[in-house]
């Protein structure tokens, strides 16, 4: 597969993955552009792989995680996760809940967020996530557990008692 074929057929899926990770379409486009420039320069090796998209997604994941090392920790803005506009009407309540979830997901540490996106959006197993992140499946489960616990606390509709 040539780079041009890859970009034409797989770019929307790769961009959507980046958008879910970043929580913002503009940031996702920057992520994807950075990665695709590097992928293009190495396409003679990447294009020969059985699953070049898997490799490019791993590059996007690594680029997303490396932002933390480059700058001070920041909360990524919540967004529509790069999803195309639906032709069906979106109910305000469902939209509000989705926006709230994306906002809370954006507050998680990057590795917890990455694990949750890979597990629930990409539907990947712990072993595959561990391979992508360069850690053990137990560490992946720990990140997922802590991330889900944080989301449960923040998304709980019951009012919290004030201390």
Stretch-by-stretch model annotation:
Residues 36-40, 50-70, 144, 148:
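Σ70-family region 2.3-2.4 aromatic/basic alpha-helix that recognizes the −10 promoter
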Residues 115-119:
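A short pre-motif secondary-structure segment
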Residues 95, 105-113:
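Short helix-coil-helix linker/hinge
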Residues 66, 74-98, 103, 125:
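Internal acidic/polar
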Residues 47, 58-79, 94, 157:
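Arg/Lys-rich amphipathic alpha helix in sigma70-family domain 2
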